[in-house]
């Protein structure tokens, strides 16, 4: 648990990014993300840690809002949750290279996925959504998909066949 609460943690994260990336926009984005996004995990401490893992491991590419970078990095906000409507989509979320190859433990990755899904994708989740577990992540996260765009496009077609149109096959 970080002393000083979430705001102190946000400033520490911002300072870390400033030291290592020397980027004022990254510091501002990290601080805003760490403070502004609501907590919905299994407790404030767990949610705070999951959010910190997001900031340090995911946000640099997927951006502070989870909106991604058009043409380069897919959005996570308001789209990732749709993939969990399909068993293959649920596996996809764990096997994209950034998740599969991350240095996060299986539990930490499960926590980050659950945090992203429950904070940025609430309306996209199936009604019977079950949070990821460390055991599930350990069983399915590797190997990473080598052609993630093709897998994604196939999943989007399967979602569209079920009447779910919330995510584009291109990003």
Walk through the language-model features, giving the residues of each:
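N-terminal secretory signal peptides that target proteins for export/translocation
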Residues: 1-21
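Bacterial N-terminal signal peptides
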Residues: 23-34
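The canonical Cys-X-X-Cys-His
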Residues: 54-64, 112
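Internal catalytic or translocation cores that form aromatic/hydrophobic pockets or channels
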Residues: 103-111, 115
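Flexible coil segments in periplasmic/lumen-exposed cytochrome c-class electron-transfer proteins
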Residues: 107, 118-171
